[in-house]
């Protein structure tokens, strides 16, 4: 008998819910069954973020740095305006109605500017004014924080100089703790950044030290982001095939907590086994080289 020659098995949310209910000895009978299962699935994704590194959720972000600005969003944060051409990079903008302020880190198009985390909340239709250029324009849509808030953590970062040129070079920068950062006595020292601290707020912030002393730097970092939500039963899930068994087992366990308490222990054991197997496979396979020490030593008798 011929094989299918297809490798596109990709269950949607509804199929995972049906599988989970069947493992609980149940069937999906009502609309509320779908709702409660979808909620459990999103909570399961949140649990995976706490359990460790999910490599398919790593993405790279590049942020142009601005002289004398040390704090940046841990992702892409933009504002859509009527016209951006008269504003200058590095200047502070102020909302005429809200009084909110932010600094411009780049002008990405004729109607979009990238900004730092605002102090206050800009509102749609208000007028913003540039502190240096005195340019004015209208905010056409509220600032969307979704991209920045999807950041779970920062894994590594480099400072790139002369991006795109033949002389492009990357210099790694080290991550420091909150305690180390707060004890830096001269946070406004200008230099090429050599360290960063991740302030893990709901809207996470990257704090650099030293404060950039030129506009030729680009901050390039790898970040761990949230798995896409399971919103619609017809949606597929943002999970690679190697995690399909783990997802089905985990959802069955979560549903059993509410609807099949007699199966909780069994389904939990299956889920933990499936997760351990999937996590072990989802690892970095870089070569490891061990070099014996050549240090001299003295044998004491």
PLM region spans:
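Glycine-enriched, solvent-exposed interface loops adjoining structured elements
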Residues: 1-76, 138-301
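Autoprocessing Asn-cyclization modules and mimics
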Residues: 52-143
């Amino acid at each position: 008998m011929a094989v299918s020659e297809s490798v596109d098995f990709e269950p949607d949310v509804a199929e995972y819910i049906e599988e989970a209910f069947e493992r609980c000895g149940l069937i999906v009978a009502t609309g509320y069954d779908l709702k409660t299962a979808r909620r459990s699935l999103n909570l399961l994704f949140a649990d995976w973020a706490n359990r460790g590194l999910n490599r398919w959720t790593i993405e790279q972000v590049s942020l142009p740095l601005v002289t004398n600005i040390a704090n940046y969003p841990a992702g892409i944060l933009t504002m859509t305006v009527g016209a951006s051409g008269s504003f200058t990079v590095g200047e502070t903008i102020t909302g005429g109605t809200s009084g909110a302020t932010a600094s411009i880190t780049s002008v990405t198009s004729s109607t979009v500017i990238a900004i730092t985390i605002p102090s206050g909340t800009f509102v749609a239709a208000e007028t913003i004014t540039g502190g240096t250029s005195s340019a004015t324009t209208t905010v056409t849509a509220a600032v969307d924080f979704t991209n920045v808030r999807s950041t779970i953590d920062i894994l590594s970062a480099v400072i790139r100089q002369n991006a795109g040129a033949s002389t492009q070079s990357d210099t790694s920068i080290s991550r420091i703790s909150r305690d180390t950062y707060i004890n830096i006595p001269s946070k406004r020292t200008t230099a090429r950044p050599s360290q960063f601290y991740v302030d893990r707020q709901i809207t996470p912030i990257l704090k650099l030290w030293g404060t950039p002393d030129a506009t030729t730097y680009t901050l390039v970092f790898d970040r761990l982001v949230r798995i896409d939500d399971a919103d619609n039963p017809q949606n597929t899930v943002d999970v690679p095939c190697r995690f399909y068994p783990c997802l089905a087992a985990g959802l069955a366990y979560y549903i059993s907590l509410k609807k099949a308490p007699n199966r909780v222990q069994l389904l939990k054991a299956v889920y933990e086994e499936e997760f351990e197997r999937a996590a072990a496979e989802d690892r970095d396979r870089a070569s490891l080289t061990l070099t014996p020490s050549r240090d001299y030593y003295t044998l004491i008798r």
